[in-house]
Amino acid sequence: IDRSFSVSGFGTVVTGTVLGGTLRRDDTVYLQGINPKPLRVRRLECYGAEVAAIQAGDRAALNLAGLDRTDVQRGLVLADRILRATSLVDATLALHAPETELGIWSQAVFLAGTAERQVRVHLLDRNRLGTGETALVQLHLQEPLPLQPGDRFVVRNSSCDVTLGGGQVLDASPLHHRRRPVRLIESLTRLIGSPLPELVALELRRARRPLTAKEIAANLNLDQEEVARAVASSPAKTLVPFDTKEGLVLVSRSYLDNLGRLLVA
């Protein structure tokens, strides 16, 4: 969302850019982080003309039933479900500003969409990041944001007058990396390019137990259909699905192999 206003006889209108998916008139959306109640889409406009649906890439205006103008601020996100906000993100960061160098810890400003947050940048795979280089980083946001794997962002200097570079979110629900072991770097490197099966496998390794597709979707800010597609495309059956009364349950192949060895022993 980049703007909001009230129209007599219609109520609150918000404008912004559609980042993904499709939205239709009478669909239900949620304002992330502020208003958890469902909001109905009364009317949609795209480039000034009323339309029945909007999709990724469109500039759009939404007239929302049940939303008070005072609840809206620039940088908020509308989605078809309630997303998990995070203040800790693993990402890639490419530094483009000339004659600039970042140390292992640096203060900066993080911008994603129209949202802006103060951030501490922690380099994971090196001690210095220079102009023209790309690093694996963990970003510590001062205030949480609803972010997803694959989201792109820009980083500016702490006074927000120079753009330092940009990057892409790899993992929006990581552990706090106090150390930088080789296995962490290898795991994050496998996430570059947003391979969804690897991200789901990482979530299962962190949990050290089977997880439902619903749990994984909630943790990663995905929908359950995306999790199901990850299972279908996982290489060499690394993700093993089970249909249960609670729905789809996923187990990593390594978890099953370890369990089998324990039972045999």
What are these regions (language model features)?
Residues 1-99:
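Conserved catalytic-core segments of large NTP-driven translation/proteostasis enzymes
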Residues 47-52, 66-265:
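C-terminal effector modules of nucleic-acid-centric enzymes and ribosome-associated factors
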